[in-house]
């Protein structure tokens, strides 16, 4: 992760009433979680498998997929960096404003990034610039909360086979 994202509340030396720097919500009753974990202490006191192959296999089986099609990560940020690494050097569009890790991961892996501030929507025109081979679209978007309808996403994908 490149500097510029994360929870920096510790820097301010005072209690912050509402912290919007992450999507972790701490103002909730955790009694149900505590009870759930208490009954599973035997299974969680061991160090986990070094790779999530068992979990990936179970997820693949549940969703009728080949196990090679499932990749369990330590969260969205790891997945973003793995995807950017896999498609290193690609012409990439990022719909803005959005989560900063998309651009950071792309810069780290040599992408040529085009920031787009409007989705292509005018009168049924769903085309992205012709040199774009990859695009990042956060849905619902972080930080705006905007939701893009499934029908629009389907049209966007169908009209941009190069991506």
What are these regions (language model features)?
Residues 1-46, 139:
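N-terminal "arm"/small-domain region of PLP-dependent enzymes with the aminotransferase-like
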Residues 18, 71, 91-93:
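Conserved beta-strand elements of the Class I
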Residues 34, 56-60, 153:
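Generic structural marker for isolated residues within well-ordered, non-membrane alpha-helices
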Residues 35, 61, 81, 85, ...:
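Short, well-ordered alpha-helices that flank and scaffold nucleotide-derived cofactor binding pockets
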Residues 48, 60-82:
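Short loop-beta-helix segment that forms the pyridoxal 5′-phosphate
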Residues 84-107, 112-114, 125-128:
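Conserved PLP-anchoring active-site segment centered on the Schiff-base-forming lysine
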């Amino acid at each position: 992760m490149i500097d510029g994202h994360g929870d920096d509340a510790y820097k301010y030396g005072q209690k912050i009433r509402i912290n919007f720097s992450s999507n972790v919500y701490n103002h909730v009753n955790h009694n149900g979680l505590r009870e759930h974990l208490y009954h599973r202490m035997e299974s969680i006191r061991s160090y986990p498998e070094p790779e999530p192959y068992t979990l990936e296999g179970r997820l693949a089986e549940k969703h009728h997929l080949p196990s090679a099609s499932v990749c369990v990560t330590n969260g969205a940020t790891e997945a973003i960096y793995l995807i950017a690494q896999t498609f290193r050097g690609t012409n990439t569009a990022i719909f803005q404003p959005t989560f900063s890790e998309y651009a950071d991961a792309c810069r780290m892996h040599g992408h040529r990034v085009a920031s787009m501030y409007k989705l292509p929507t005018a009168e049924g025109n769903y085309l992205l610039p012709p040199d774009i081979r990859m695009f990042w679209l956060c849905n619902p978007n972080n930080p705006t909360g905007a939701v893009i309808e499934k029908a629009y996403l389907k049209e966007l994908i169908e009209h941009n086979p190069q991506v």
